[in-house]
From Swiss-Prot:
Homotetramer. Zn(2+) binds at residues 68, 87, 89, 147. This is L-fuculose phosphate aldolase. InterPro entries: Aldolase_class_II_sugar_metab, Aldolase_II/adducin_N, Aldolase_II/adducin_N_sf, Fuculose-P_aldolase. Involved in the biosynthesis of the coenzyme F420 which requires phospholactate produced via the aldol cleavage of L-fuculose 1-phosphate and the NAD(+)-dependent oxidation of (S)-lactaldehyde. Catalyzes the reversible cleavage of L-fuculose 1-phosphate (Fuc1P) to yield dihydroxyacetone phosphate (DHAP) and S-lactaldehyde. Belongs to the aldolase class II family. AraD/FucA subfamily. Pathway: Cofactor biosynthesis; coenzyme F420 biosynthesis. Its cofactor is Zn(2+). The lineage of its organism: Archaea, Methanobacteriati, Methanobacteriota, Methanomada group, Methanococci. It catalyses: L-fuculose 1-phosphate = (S)-lactaldehyde + dihydroxyacetone phosphate.
Amino acid sequence: MDLKEFIKICHLLYDRKYVVGSGGNVSLKKDNLVYITPTGSILGFLNEEDICVVDIAGKIIKGKPTSELNMHLEIYRNKPHVNAVVHTHSMYCTAFSVLDKKLELYTPEAEIFLKKIGYVDYCPCGTLELAECVSSCNEDVLILKKHGIVTLGSTLTEAYIKTEVLEEIAKLNHIVMSFDK
């Protein structure tokens, strides 16, 4: 499988500061296989050979996958239209998740790409509880309380664009709120 786009998306997430350090993870489903970032990896420094491979049942074929593997697998098992998952801890979205504030979709772009944002109550990172809460949501754009965001798409590019638009709309919400004082 050609993983050039996968690596490009990981590098973009890091370069644009949607992830820092070893935070965040990315996966792509192709047939019965899931290509996923390794645990503890820095997305900006990943190469194709670093990507882990797991089957949809959870059997590890290659590497040591992210601690959020269960979340990715549960999403794929419960949402057949999803082939890509991006999970980040972007600054503005995470700040709003900590404050438990809902975002307004102020722009046409946000309405088109995001449609509706789902909000997930706090669940500990890497747990089956988090995996079940996230995978049971109807929305493809999710804000996880005190944690970050998850965006879903039929392609990695689609999931990435949702991440980018969501962080921009969070920045816009912050600006609007500061003017409103």
